[in-house]
Amino acid sequence: SGINPGANVGRSVYHSGTIGACLTARNGGITGVAVSQAVDEGGYMGQGIEEMLRNQKWDSAAEIAALAVGEMCTNLPKEASVLNINVPNMDVSEMKGWAQTTVGTDLMRQMTEVDIEPKIGHEGAYHLNLKWGERITPSSIDNDVGAVANGYVSISWLSRLISQEPPSGSSVESRLDSIFTD
């Protein structure tokens, strides 16, 4: 899936359609590869818009994608998997290398302002405007955000969404018991 304009790193992994397509494939027993490329211009991280894409180095992302997908097809993993690849927006010759990464929690830009405006004609609905500040460059390349921000291709294998034990203090279960218990 991809090449997606805008890095799918950190928090954006959770709402990425590019990654969602690969997760869906894995649910059907098919290995998926999501490829995304950082967008350097504009005021926010994530999905780029038309005017932000004029200086994209698509050939670089395509070269990395072709190499990874070709190898994946030659040597498929034994079980259906999802590989998330994020490529910096630069020539391959300028990249520092690649890094095996975890999904980060850092942002690539600070959020400076959030405006909430009522949506005219839609009672109870609002339009949310996010304004992003200066670019942040995390020092660690151990996570996907830091790797891409520092000029490395990020390679992350994504796991399934799995359930967990209820968090301490959760009362949802006992509340549900109250309506289903005689």
Which residues are covered by each model-predicted region?
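Glycine/threonine-rich flexible loop motifs
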Residues: 7-16
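Active-site-proximal region of nucleotide-activated glycan assembly enzymes
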Residues: 56-63
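Short acidic, glycine-rich surface-loop motifs adjacent to enzyme active sites
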Residues: 1-6
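C-terminal accessory domains and tails appended to enzymatic cores
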Residues: 51-55, 73-182
